[in-house]
Amino acid sequence: MNVLLCSINTLKRLYDISAVEVGQHFYWQIGGFLVHAQVLITSWVVIAILLVSAFLVIRNLQTIPAFGQNFFEYVLEFIRDVSKTQIGEEYGPWVPFIGTLFLFIFVSNWSGALFPWKIIQLPHGELAAPTNDINTTVALALLTSVAYFYAGLSKKGLAYFSKYIQPTPILLPINILEDFTKPLSLSFRLFGNILADELVVVVLVSLVPLVVPIPVMFLGLFTSGIQALIFATLAAAYIGESIEGHH
């Protein structure tokens, strides 16, 4: 009898977990539009963290940097190295864009593991990391697509479109399709990894004591950082590809 009750309780917990739907959202009605409030709230929190951190560091710059300034200088140097490696000698104007992508995704990913979003009650759905929502990752991927089109057109003008018939016009459909698969792969890779990590943690916390999921949480922090680096590196690589005209 006890075994049966335990099995029923376990199945009930699994059913409760399965009720967390990716499409269950909280909306604001603004005029005639429905605004996805969950993503906006968590994104504003992440942006506020980045802006406040940057303000605290740059308000009192010193020749001999303290810990905060030294850390930000290291991050900036790291982003510059990634940009230069992937884009080439014309990397300078693109450092702010690549850096913004990396820092926003990095802090967003970590916020999902470190912030107690779920204690904030909403009428519908629940708060989570911004990158846990497909709308955010698709928006970031589309921004990247706009960036590498702009990079190619500003460097080569209309001659940029000649790449679609190189090395032979037969590859025209494939080259066009590639421009659609790039943002799709960027967005779904990031979304899938972050969503899977959070779901694994939720399932483990529901089924086993809290101590057991802790290693998975630390692994999630590591993979979250890696995903931010992969996204920023690929974005820089696509921009460099548009500028240099090679694959």
Swiss-Prot record:
Question: Where does the chain cross the membrane?
Answer: 38-58, 95-115, 134-154, 199-219, 220-240
Question: Any idea where this protein resides?
Answer: Plastid, Chloroplast thylakoid membrane
By its UniProt entry, which Pfam families does this protein fall under? Answer: ATP-synt_A (PF00119)
Keyword line: ATP synthesis, CF(0), Chloroplast, Hydrogen ion transport, Ion transport, Membrane, Plastid, Thylakoid, Transmembrane, Transmembrane helix, Transport
Q: What is its main location?
A: plastid
Protein topology in the membrane: Multi-pass membrane protein
InterPro entries from the UniProt entry: ATP_syn_F0_a_bact/chloroplast (IPR045082), ATP_synth_F0_asu (IPR000568), ATP_synth_F0_asu_AS (IPR023011), F0_ATP_A_sf (IPR035908)
Family from the record? Belongs to the ATPase A chain family.
Assembly mode = F-type ATPases have 2 components, CF(1) - the catalytic core - and CF(0) - the membrane proton channel. CF(1) has five subunits: alpha(3), beta(3), gamma(1), delta(1), epsilon(1). CF(0) has four main subunits: a, b, b' and c.
Protein name as catalogued? ATP synthase subunit a, chloroplastic
Q: Which organism is it from?
A: Phaseolus vulgaris
